[in-house]
Each structure stands twice: as structure tokens, then as C-alpha cells.
Amino acid sequence: MNVLKTLLTLILITVSGTNNISGEKPRNLFFLDSLDVKDTVHGIDISFYQKKIQWHKLPNDICFVVIKATEGSKLKDTKFKENWDSAGKNGYIRGAYHFYRPYVTPYSQFRNFISVVKLKKGDLPPVVDAEIHSKYTKKLQNDLKIFLNLLERYYKVKPIIYCNAPFYRKHFYHSYFDQYHFWIADYRGKNLDSTMKMWDFWQYTCWGNVNGIKGYVDKNYYRWGYDSLKNICVK
């Protein structure tokens, strides 16, 4: 989730943000036509980049918060525990994500993640942030299969895959991965349904502004409604 943001700083993109997430209409206007916005669920994803969050000031229409936990085989987000505990105490559906490194073994990345993340009933499944390309596409796919299977066996729930649209088309447009929930990052204002076989979460901007967080934050929709979101959580 941070590589895509870094790349986007190299180009000029204007995305307006408001403190009321449900009042913000993203550029992907097809979304308003194809979905009932009243039934969508709003969320943010955060890491140490957001620094100190004033949780009591966050907008009421935020339902879920996904928090960076680990990256590769060694890195642990320095704000994870604080953010994880605070999200739970403030009543949010919370999730943890791992930033996947393609040239690091899936086994060492799995050990890093489970050393930090202890999921409980009502938490979102683990999220795998896969956005770094590899010239060895087949190996990357096989390693991701191993990593996803390790997570599923350990947490007893099927992981969520986060990626951007080009990464999805190159690496995940394969029937094996259809079993997973997909969280797609796409800020270009194009029809997501025309290029994706399936998606459940949509990260529509990385330039969001909300009360309680200084600077920008990623904003997201879950498209199937609150009850459905609760249903995919850890039982």
C-alpha cells in the first residue's frame, strides 16, 4: 500500500477529501451507478505513516480499519500494537496486513506475520498486500499460493488479497485465485468492473483527509454491505 502511494507522488493527481467519508464522491463515478452507496461500508488503512491517531475524532461512518503489521521477513510496523489495540477499544472492525516481498521466502514472511498478529473473533481475515512485481511471474504466483495457504491453515480463515489493478491482471487473473476476496487499489476513475473479474474492497484514493488523522490516509469501500463484511470475519 506504500509503493503505489510513492509512485503516485511523482504525478499530479487532484483528489478532494472531506471529513465525512460517505459524503465524498470518488472519481470512479461508475461506482455510484452500479452500487447502492447507502449499502457500502467505509474504511481506512493505516500504518506508522499516519503517526498519532486521535481515534475519538474519526468520522462516525468509518466501520473498518486495516493496519499494517509486517513487511517481508523481518520488518514490524512500529505503530501496529498501538493502532491494533486502539481500533479494538474504539469498536472498529479491524484487520492486519502484511506487505509481501517477492524475493523473500513465503515461510519466513509467514513467521514474521504470525509473531505479531493474533486474530480474535470479529477481526477481518489477514490481508496480503501484493504490489511488487517480479520478472518470475510463475514463481511469484507459487510463492503467494504457499503464503496464502499457510495463513489460512494457521488462522482458520481465507486471507484477503490487496493489489492494484495492473498487478491483478498480470498475476491473479487465474482461476486458482478466484477463491479469495480481492481488495483493489484503483484511483484512475475507470470502470473497475470492466477490467477485474471480481473485487470486494476498493481503495479509491490514497489522498483522503479525515478528522483525527494528520495528513493523507487511504480510503476504501467494501461493496457488499455491513452484514456481509461481518460474515467474512474470523468466527
Regions found by a protein language model. Give the residues of each.
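Acidic-and-aromatic substrate-binding clefts and catalytic sites of carbohydrate-active enzymes
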Residues: 44-54, 70-80, 99-108, 133-138, ...
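Bacterial Sec-dependent N-terminal signal peptides
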Residues: 1-24
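Boundary/entry segment of secreted carbohydrate-active catalytic domains
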Residues: 21-72
